């Protein structure tokens, strides 16, 4: 089965009305536009998204829906660093340092809380900076992602020069 577009999200439906099969993905697999996976029920699926979400697949995204059958995304828990900032200045410092490492950064559950995938050098840096943190198991859902850059990706838009010499993004 080849999936070329998303159909919706489970949060917009009552999952009890459907037979839901899940594709379990690691957080870093949610940004793939082309991939092969096996569902929990053993179905082989190929993803070739034409208009992939800029942030990636999110928890509950529906890849396939036909009558009462649904195949949806489940993002697996992974080891993450939960970061708790004490001030706006510390938020700026955290965002700068994490961004400087080109690491993924996600919103946390509360104000001034962030999450990033666990890496020992990042943990050591946060300790050195005196930033409050703890290592926990958590989902890194693309809809909570702060950073949108994708290495080695092609833009999803066309840039052209208009007759009045203005740059037009379509």
Swiss-Prot record:
Protein species of origin: Helicobacter pylori (strain J99 / ATCC 700824) (Campylobacter pylori J99)
Cited InterPro entries: UreE, UreE_C_dom, UreE_N, UreE_N_sf
Swiss-Prot/TrEMBL GO biological process terms: protein folding; protein-containing complex assembly; urea metabolic process
Xref: HAMAP family: UreE (MF_00822)
Highest taxon of the lineage: Bacteria
GO cellular component terms, semicolon-separated: cytoplasm
Protein family (similarity comment): Belongs to the UreE family.
UniProt subcellular location: Cytoplasm
Keywords linked to the UniProt accession: Chaperone, Cytoplasm, Nickel, Nickel insertion
UniProt function note: Involved in urease metallocenter assembly. Binds nickel. Probably functions as a nickel donor during metallocenter assembly.
MF (Gene Ontology): nickel cation binding; unfolded protein binding
Name of the molecule in the record: Urease accessory protein UreE
NCBIfam families with a match to the protein in the record: PRK13261.1-6
């Amino acid at each position: 089965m080849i999936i070329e577009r998303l159909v919706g999200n489970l949060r917009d439906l009552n999952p009890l009305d459907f037979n839901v099969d899940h594709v379990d993905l690691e957080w870093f697999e949610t940004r793939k536009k082309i991939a092969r996976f096996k569902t929990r029920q053993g179905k082989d699926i190929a993803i070739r998204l034409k208009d992939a979400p800029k942030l990636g697949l999110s928890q509950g995204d529906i890849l396939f829906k036909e009558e009462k059958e649904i195949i949806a995304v489940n993002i697996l828990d992974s080891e993450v660093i939960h970061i708790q900032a004490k001030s706006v200045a510390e938020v700026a410092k955290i965002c700068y340092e994490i961004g400087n490492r080109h690491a993924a950064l996600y919103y946390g559950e509360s104000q001034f809380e962030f999450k990033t995938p666990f890496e020992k050098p990042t943990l050591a840096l946060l300790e050195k900076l005196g930033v409050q943190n703890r290592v926990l198991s958590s989902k890194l859902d693309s809809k909570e992602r702060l950073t949108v850059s994708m290495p080695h990706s092609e833009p999803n838009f066309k840039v052209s020069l208009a007759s009045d010499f203005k740059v037009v993004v379509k």
